[in-house]
């Protein structure tokens, strides 16, 4: 079974041809698409897209709801409550995309850690898997995950591009690993090719 676990389907580039994209995916043998929520607004949008296209594509569309580390600075008192409400939708299968990204720091590391831990607590409370993002922050992310792992039902590190040490750290926590297209890139994917 082919499942695309990280579909940024609310992006405006799909505004004109969402139905055709879904048809092509189905025709190519992709049985399930998990639409990624990266902010409160994007989480609302992907849940709405699941409802909008769910009748035409039954049992194909699912969603995550969460706040990406780039958007962690937007976390406020209402954010987690809205995510909790969205997570009650039957199409929602995970909390995230969450984690740490110290590569560009669109949000400060402290803001990212606060948002990450708030979402881990929500996932543990709701007993939903977590959909993780990490870039240049493996040591700290693993440290935080070790604190929460026993309370989480499941987790996947989406779009893994890290080192052997990071990979083994995630596997030691019994996390699933999502492989990115970088594995096919001779310049960026050489180390990743060896790990796969």
What are the language-model segments listed below?
Residues 1-196:
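Mid-domain alpha/beta scaffold segments of enzyme catalytic cores
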């Amino acid at each position: 079974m082919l499942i695309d676990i990280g579909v940024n389907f609310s992006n405006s580039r799909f505004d004109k041809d969402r139905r055709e994209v879904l048809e092509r995916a189905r025709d190519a043998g992709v049985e399930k698409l998990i639409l990624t929520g990266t902010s409160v607004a994007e989480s609302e949008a992907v849940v709405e897209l699941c409802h909008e296209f769910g009748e035409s594509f039954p049992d194909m569309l699912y969603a995550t709801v969460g706040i990406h580390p780039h958007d962690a600075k937007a976390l406020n008192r209402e954010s987690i409550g809205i995510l909790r409400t969205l997570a009650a939708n039957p199409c929602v299968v995970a909390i995230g995309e969450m984690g740490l990204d110290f590569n560009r720091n669109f949000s400060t590391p402290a803001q990212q850690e606060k948002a990450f831990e708030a979402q881990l607590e929500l996932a543990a409370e709701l007993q939903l898997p977590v959909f993780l993002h990490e870039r240049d922050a493996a040591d700290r992310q693993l440290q935080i995950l070790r604190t929460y792992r026993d309370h989480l039902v499941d987790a996947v590190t989406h779009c893994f591009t890290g080192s052997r040490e990071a990979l083994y750290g995630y596997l030691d926590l019994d996390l699933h690993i999502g492989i990115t297209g970088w594995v096919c890139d001779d310049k960026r994917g050489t180390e990743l090719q060896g790990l796969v």
